Amino acid sequence: MKKTTLALGMHDKLFKRARTMYQIEHCICDLLMTKGFLRIETPTLEHFEVFSDVVDNGNYNFFDKNGDLISLRPDITSQIGRVIASTQVHTPIKFSYSGKVFNYNEEMRGLSNEHTQAGVEIIGFPVHQALEEAVISAKEALDVAGVRNYKFEFSHAQLLQLIFEELNLPAVKEAELATYIRDKSITGLKEFTKENPSQYDKVLEQLPSLFGETTAVLTEARQLTDNESFLTALDSLEVLTSRLADNLPETTLDLAQLPAVPYYTGIMFKVFGDKVPDAFVSGGRYDKLFERFGATELTAVGWAIDIDSVYQAVHDDVEFGGDMDD
């Protein structure tokens, strides 16, 4: 029976889906190369340490014939960090890429474990320039892919990092707080601040409401703390969204946005659309990634677009003349 069944979380892509996803991927890649991003391809298999210092059960891990622990790549950004640290590549430099990534989801969640991504990494450039180029190139990629009615949502990794550092919680309590933040649990966060008081009590209690139109969220957040580092992070969000106003007249913030990956250190962004429940673009600043590989800190901004999700967003607009439509 297993000869004809798929492994957990894997799917065949047929006809309309296969053709459309191929076209989306190549349109985005061609666009990025014309904008000066150098194409890079990295291996599907890597030593597990490239992605994490400890074995991550969310990754596909196995031992090769030499006894080395190998992972199917869960992301490509970490691999580019390895490339920068281990080769003679000179910075500043801009990369573009596309390829398969793999994340293990439990069977009951019903999620796909294989995705096609395309993305960019902008390394060694002035941070404001890199952030603007990253956001604008992500917008252009969505446009060339035919996505309509999408919105950029921004946050800053340092906001929650400051709170977690101040609280200095044991791992179990840290995970509990992260769950309350992710779920926007008003009751959970209020109870948590009673048990774990800090200078950020007001911020934590209001986090579930600190999302929406950029100016309104910034105004409310600034009234909740006088911590200089926290306010500086808010200022950087205001500066970036103001500089992007001509390209993105409408932006939103979500200050409760937890980093999608652990290496984000600054401004982060996601893109949401009408027809897809989750973000189909995620990106941000990750200056400290290279230190994991023994290299010096570099300014770095990147994003990845999920081609599978983009297909869901444009599916209804794509005509297909074949015998089967998936």
From Swiss-Prot:
GO CC terms of this entry: cytoplasm
A GO molecular-function descriptor: catalytic activity, acting on a protein
Pathway(s) annotated for this protein in UniProt: Amino-acid biosynthesis; L-histidine biosynthesis; L-histidine from 5-phospho-alpha-D-ribose 1-diphosphate: step 1/9
Pfam families reported for this sequence: tRNA-synt_His
A biological process term (GO) from this entry: L-histidine biosynthetic process
Subcellular location: Cytoplasm
Keyword set includes Signal: no
Key words, A-Z: Amino-acid biosynthesis, Cytoplasm, Histidine biosynthesis
InterPro entries according to UniProt: aa-tRNA-synth_II/BPL/LPL, HisRS-like_core, HisRS/HisZ, HisZ
Main location per the UniProt record: cytoplasm
Note: This function is generally fulfilled by the C-terminal part of HisG, which is missing in some bacteria such as this one.
Family listed: Belongs to the class-II aminoacyl-tRNA synthetase family. HisZ subfamily.
Assembly, per entry: Heteromultimer composed of HisG and HisZ subunits.
Function: Required for the first step of histidine biosynthesis. May allow the feedback regulation of ATP phosphoribosyltransferase activity by histidine.
PANTHER family the record matches: ATP PHOSPHORIBOSYLTRANSFERASE REGULATORY SUBUNIT (PTHR43707:SF6), HISTIDYL-TRNA SYNTHETASE (PTHR43707)
The protein's name in its UniProt record: ATP phosphoribosyltransferase regulatory subunit
Species of origin: Streptococcus thermophilus (strain ATCC BAA-491 / LMD-9)
